[in-house]
Amino acid sequence: MTWITPKKAIMLAAAAEGGTKLNAFDNALLKMGIGNVNLVKLSSVIPAHIEWLDELPKNIPIGMLLPTVYAHIESDEPGSTISAALGVGISEGNEGGLIYEYAGYCKREEAEDMVRKMVEEGFKVRGWKLKEFKVVSAEITVKEKPAAAVAAVIMFPY
């Protein structure tokens, strides 16, 4: 297998219910348009000069391996609010960046605040200058069915 440094990326988030916690997770992936691919979990470094997409590319082959950073949480506890967030920091000159993920029993705003703090610290310890911060998040309150919140950065080699 040959790995290629990704050239494009997109930020996505969704929340969904399902018959089980795993089905809720799958349903959230389907809502995001990535339920029929294989997500390959990455750590959190963004390649230099990556292009950010506003929508998913068309005709992604079923089963395609897609490099992904994602946060997820599932719960079947009625009344619980769960959230997942990803924070993306882009460096000056777009020479690279960082992605941090968080998921927990909390409101969306708390998850977003957490990833912002993590991005800022990640840049500080590297001595990088933060030019731009982006965030994507999902929140859901569990009702009668299990629920999931998922946030992801999907990277594409083309």
From Swiss-Prot:
<keyword id="KW-0210">Decarboxylase</keyword>
<comment type="similarity">
    <text>Belongs to the PdaD family.</text>
</comment>
<dbReference type="InterPro" id="IPR016105">
    <property type="entry name" value="Pyr-dep_his/arg-deCO2ase_sand"/>
</dbReference>
<dbReference type="GO" id="GO:0008792">
    <property type="term" value="F:arginine decarboxylase activity"/>
</dbReference>
<feature type="site" description="Cleavage (non-hydrolytic)">
    <location>
        <begin position="43"/>
        <end position="44"/>
    </location>
</feature>
<dbReference type="InterPro" id="IPR016104">
    <property type="entry name" value="Pyr-dep_his/arg-deCO2ase"/>
</dbReference>
<feature type="modified residue" description="Pyruvic acid (Ser)">
    <location>
        <position position="44"/>
    </location>
</feature>
<dbReference type="GO" id="GO:0006527">
    <property type="term" value="P:arginine catabolic process"/>
</dbReference>
<dbReference type="InterPro" id="IPR002724">
    <property type="entry name" value="Pyruvoyl-dep_arg_deCO2ase"/>
</dbReference>
<keyword id="KW-0670">Pyruvate</keyword>
<dbReference type="Pfam" id="PF01862">
    <property type="entry name" value="PvlArgDC"/>
</dbReference>
<protein>
    <recommendedName>
        <fullName>Pyruvoyl-dependent arginine decarboxylase</fullName>
        <ecNumber>4.1.1.19</ecNumber>
    </recommendedName>
</protein>
<keyword id="KW-0456">Lyase</keyword>
